[in-house]
Amino acid sequence: MCYHIFAFIAGFVLDLLIGDPHFIPHPVRLIGSLISFLDKRLNCDAGCNISEKKLNLIKYKRGMRLAFTVIFATFAISVIIIVAAYSINLYAGVIVEAVMTWQILATKCLRVESMRVYDALRTDGVDAGRRAVSMIVGRDTSVLDAAGVTRAAVETIAENTSDGVIAPMLYTAIGGPVLGFVYKAVNTMDSMLGYKNDKYMYFGRFAARLDDVVNFIPARISAYLMIAAAFIGGRHFDGKNAYRIFKRDRFNHASPNSAQTESVCAGALRVQLAGDAVYFGKLVKKKYIGDGLREIEYEDIKRANRLMYITAFLCELLSVAVMSLVLILL
């Protein structure tokens, strides 16, 4: 057990130091390729004259088949890699486990991608900011002003603190890289298939609901850790307001999980997030999160990243403490 804890810590350190260099093939991209492959073959009309209701049911079942196939493949390959590494020797196993843990986490990647938006806004203006933020959000960025670009970046940091950092960290702490990669597979399926349009309304529904389930508890743990981070993070954060806005606005989102950390971040920064947005040319009405006690500014991107990093360190410490306690008790 102690070497699993070492690999867990080493993976987190590697993530902080290296992040996700584009020249290194990332396992999540391979998972995405498998999802795309199955999507093209399963997400199509049944090929016969049937009612719309039956067609939608067929699409839903095919979406389930895709989800279980991706999960099984991810689980099996992860187990094979881990077992093969430890069968060589303990050192090889620990190294491979640490590298896999590193690939599961996205702490530095999230900071790097969001800081590109910050740098673009600060040095080149709103047009450059729109182009930069379009790489990390799904909304139409061409209609955003500087505040809108900043808001989109801060929302992405806040939401992905849970999805990209805390949730995979917790699952890896519980079940090692195998469970961590299974979580990443579910999250990737939701990102690729969880759209409410004609193509994915039924085909992607199972993946979207499964993602809601696996993120339900981690999102709430993330929120409370982020509240703690707001209290200890320094003068730029308002811990009391973070808790107040969390209690009030944590369900102001179509997803049961997304507003958990977004509400904390909005309260901690004393800004207003969310609200209406344009997706694929259509205006989508959304509730606001936060009171907007001050105007949002591009420096809030840096502050949101600081909040995310403190939250990640708190989760790492908590995870290691619990793993160590289990080791002592066993």
Give the positions of each predicted feature:
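Hydrophobic alpha-helical transmembrane segments
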Residues: 1-181, 186, 194-330
